[in-house]
Structures are given as C-alpha cells and as structure tokens.
A protein has these predicted regions:
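Helix-helix packing/entry segments at the starts of transmembrane helices
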Residues: 97-103, 170, 174-186, 222-253
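Membrane-interface helix termini and inter-helical loops of multi-pass transporters
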Residues: 25-35, 90-93, 136-148, 195-211, ...
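Structural signature of hydrophobic alpha-helical transmembrane segments
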Residues: 34-46, 87-104, 146-159, 204-218, ...
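Hydrophobic alpha-helical transmembrane segments of multi-pass membrane transport proteins
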Residues: 18-22, 26, 72-87, 155-166, ...
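C-terminal transmembrane-helix exit sites in multi-pass transporters
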Residues: 87, 104-126, 246-265
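Glycine-/small-residue-enriched transmembrane alpha-helix faces in small-molecule transporters
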Residues: 1-37, 144-169
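Membrane-interface interhelical linkers
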Residues: 1-18, 47-73, 122, 172-174, ...
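Hydrophobic transmembrane alpha-helices of multi-pass small-molecule transport proteins
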Residues: 123-139, 263-282
C-alpha cells in the first residue's frame, strides 16, 4: 500500500512533537543543571549532526556575502529565543511554556507583513487578535515577580518569530542544513563561556539526560519538523505541531503532578481552536 506524502508529513510532525516533548521533560528533570549548560548540550548534538550531514552531502558551508547578516540574525535570535524557552520550561508547567512558544506563528505573520511585505487578510487578522487574547489568559498580567517566567516565554515566541521570518526570507538562498549548522555553532560558542562561569558537574544520570534527553530529543524534534515540511506543505501539516500542548499537559500531570490553572486552560483552548481556524482558512486559500 502506497503511503501518501501528507501521511508521511503528519507522521514526521508527530515525531517532532514527541522529540520536543521528551526534551521538555528532560529540561524539567534537571533542576540542578544551569540553563546555559542545558542549552550547550542541546546545541552540541545538533551541531555534530548538522556538520556530519553536510560532510556526507559534500556541501560547502560557505554563505554568499549578502546573506551573511541574515544567517547571523537567524542564529542570534534563535539562540536567545532558545535560552528564553528553556528558562520558561524550567519555571512554568510544560504546557504553559509550550502554549507561549506556539504563539511564534503569530509573530512570523506580523514580521512577514512588515519586513517581507506579505499580505495578511481579514481572517488572519482575526486569528492574530484571538492569539494575542490567549496571551493574557496564559500570562495573567500582574506586578508580581511570578509573571516573569511567562513574559520570558512570550519573549521566546517573539524571537522565534524573528528567526522563522529570516528563515522564510533565506528559503532558496541558503540550505536549511547550513542554517541549522550556523545556528548550532553560534549557540555552542556563546553558551560555552557562560556555562563554564557556573559549571555544575553532572552525575551519570544527568549526563544521560543532557545528551539523550535534551540533545538527541531536540535533534529528533528539529529533524522531524524538517522532514514534515519536506513531504507536505505547511498548510497541511502545521496544525499537528499544536499536539505538543496536549502531550505537555499529560506529561505535566503524569510526571510532575501539576496541571495548568483555569486561565491557562482557557488560553490553551483559544490557541488550539484559533490554530485550527487558521489552518482551515490557509488550506482553503491554497486549494
């Protein structure tokens, strides 16, 4: 029986969800290990894998002069956004951190409209407004220090929006493997001195969680995402990326005995239903 490209795309998107879910679990399971140390190991694995893939493909890592600032910008925004996302995962429930992180498509749309002059229709504007409403429910704005992790989580989504917008601009100009290579390289270079300033020697279990739980799982998530969009267009498979909100809620309850509060549930419901609404709208536009 022939398996359709869409089915393959959905399969790889769900593999990506599993990878990033396992990564989130590992991040929370290592409270003793500083954030920068976790980010270093996460990107070390991606750097080694991307370098190996480029070597196997005999691909040059040279980037055209006019694209260098954009590759650097993508790497820088991606790195800072990742640090912010790890901080959010450490200090919020997995579900809340991933709800905020999944707002990045909203900021991609806004950035693409401003910088790439892409057109946004009325239904997309409605979707953006609904998503921003969801932010209020998840963050629950106040003057308390307790709101800081939520704001950092939102900041990670904004930076991811910048990063993905640059990736969209570089499409056809720079291969995705080269983007991943330089993003991972910059992250490793930036986190190494910060990690050494406050290095915590991991025990055997923590080494396993850093390399496999965070590094390999994140690579699984990243490559799953890449393959998903290789087999099927974003309009057909992107919606399945939001399954991570549900898997995160389950893992929060099963492993950490925590559940998001009512306001976060409402925010998550708005995010998922708006994502479905935009998915159906975008799919209709492409048909």
């Amino acid at each position: 029986m022939m398996i359709s490209d869409k089915t393959k795309g959905v399969f790889w998107m769900l593999i990506s969800v599993l990878g990033f879910t396992f990564m989130g679990i590992a991040v929370k399971y290592l409270p003793r290990i500083p954030t920068y140390e976790k980010v270093f190991f996460r990107n070390s694995v991606s750097f080694i894998l991307s370098a190996y893939i480029l070597y196997r493909q005999k691909e040059s890592i040279k980037v055209a002069k006019e694209n260098i600032p954009f590759v650097f910008g993508r790497s820088f925004f991606g790195f800072v956004g990742m640090v912010a996302n790890f901080y959010a995962l450490e200090n919020l429930t997995m579900a809340e951190a991933n709800m905020l992180n999944k707002l990045s498509p909203v900021f991609v749309t806004i950035c693409a409209c401003i910088f790439l002059k892409e057109k946004v229709d009325k239904k997309q504007v409605i979707g953006i407004v609904l998503m921003l409403m969801a932010v209020v429910f998840v963050i629950k704005p106040s003057f308390s220090p307790e709101v800081i992790p939520s704001l950092v989580g939102l900041f990670s989504a904004i930076l991811a929006g910048f990063s993905y917008t640059i990736i969209r601009y570089l499409h056809g100009k720079v291969k995705s493997e080269i983007n991943v290579f330089y993003f991972s390289l910059l992250s490793v270079i930036c986190t190494f001195p910060l990690m050494m300033m406050n290095f915590v020697k991991p025990n055997l279990f923590e080494v396993f969680m850093l390399i496999v739980g965070i590094g390999v799982s994140a690579a699984m998530g990243q490559f799953g995402l890449t393959y998903a969009y290789t087999f099927a267009p974003a309009s057909e498979v992107s919606i399945y990326n939001y399954v991570i909100i549900i898997t995160s809620m389950l893992m929060d309850y099963i492993l950490f005995s925590t559940i998001p509060d009512l306001f976060s549930f409402i925010g998550g419901f708005i995010i998922i239903t708006t994502a479905i609404y935009l998915y159906l709208h975008n799919k209709k536009k492409t048909e």
